[in-house]
Amino acid sequence: MTELRYDVIVLGGGPAGLAAAISAHKNGANVLLIEREHKLGGILKQCVHDGFGLIRFGERLTGPEYSGRFIREFLSLGIDYRINALVTDAEKNSDGFTLTVQSAQGILICRSKAVVIACGCRERTSRQVFIHGDRPAGIYTAGTAQYFVNILGQMPTRRCVILGSGDIGMIMARRLTLEGASVEGVYEIKDTPAGLARNVHQCLHDFNIPLHLSTTVTKVFGVKRVEAVEVCQVDEKMQPIESTARIIPCDALILSVGLLPENEVAQMLGVRLDPATKGAVVDQTLMTNIPGVFSCGNALHVNDLVDYVSLSGDQAGESAAEYCKGDKNAADRVPVEYDRAKFLYVVPQYYDKAAKDGMTMYFRPRSEFKKQSVTVASGSDALINKKFANLSSSEMEVLKSENISDRITDKITVSMEDMK
């Protein structure tokens, strides 16, 4: 076994991990990045459509173009990294953290003062949404179908049904249509699309692909291969209405039914997770409840845009490097509270008055709202106020403020009310 020592270890070589490693390096830390796949870039390697980088670079880039800019900078800085490497154990000890890594070079014992969790997220599967029927070939997550088409150059279907209107599902509806497949429809159990409005228009409406709201797949037919699926409309409690059932012949069912942050290593280290985001509970520096462990990107919460993933990677890397310098004051955290009837989640969940001033806050509304004013306050002092013409659970919103630590006297509250 080989033993290695670093200031910061970054787990994940996608857009968040690359940004975190670059940021930590630029702030003086000795960094190791660990990536389990054979190439850097994360999921962006297979996202050949454009639309990335509008916020970060002010231009429309494909996924490989966006990640390529970070990879080139990362390599030019000479930051140490391991690909085809998997963390099998992680523990906190008196002088930092010890990670056991299985790699092509053998078993590595990696020690560090800080760890950045940037492992991204994974897709829900058919077993996690309780679809009845056999388990024939032809049931894919949207990401798997995307990998077949964009990386392997293979067509996984000629006639498919897509369950769920997440962004990847809608993007794959367009991609499969362009490659000659027939997409019978996109079926969404909720009464509003789950993905961005621009994807509804650009991927579905522009290609005449039908979107069926308040409808779900209830059964899969086929033994060796998918032959058909049963779809039903649902009531207000999202229970299938049996009288509306109909059979749709197809050779594949593609699932776009949500994403889950990857936090197995975080849990090994004792990181507390937020039931709302399925990611870590953090303060504005993105440090978790375990001192020295930071979380960013889709491992923290599922983002709509990769630009925000990179932004949180920047913050986590900078914070990890500062933590390693050892001059951080004792934490003085106040909780961030919000109305759970109106907000699905708010990140960060705490504000540390002893840490870096200012805050970038992310939130997702629980449903559709029109003409709303969102206020972040401490006591009677409004720290941030922003007005929104439209709010939707399909789109994450961002609030920013500087120089607020001296104004925080009590817990922070996030509220939403009709604009006057």
Question: What residue spans do the PLM features occupy?
Answer:
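Aromatic sugar-binding surface patches on proteins
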Residues: 391-400
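Short, aromatic- and glycine-rich surface loops/edge beta-strands on solvent-exposed regions
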Residues: 361, 374-376, 401-420
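A Rossmann-like FAD-binding core segment of flavoenzymes
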Residues: 74-101, 177-264, 357-390
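Predominantly flavin-linked oxidoreductase catalytic cores and closely associated redox partners
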Residues: 108, 114-211, 216-225, 292-295, ...
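Beta1-alpha1 glycine-rich phosphate/pyrophosphate-binding loop at the start
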Residues: 6-69, 73, 147, 155-202, ...
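FAD-site-proximal beta/loop scaffold in flavoenzymes
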Residues: 117, 139-149, 252-303
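Mid-to-C-terminal Rossmann-like scaffold of FAD/NAD(P)H-dependent oxidoreductases
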Residues: 307, 315, 319-387
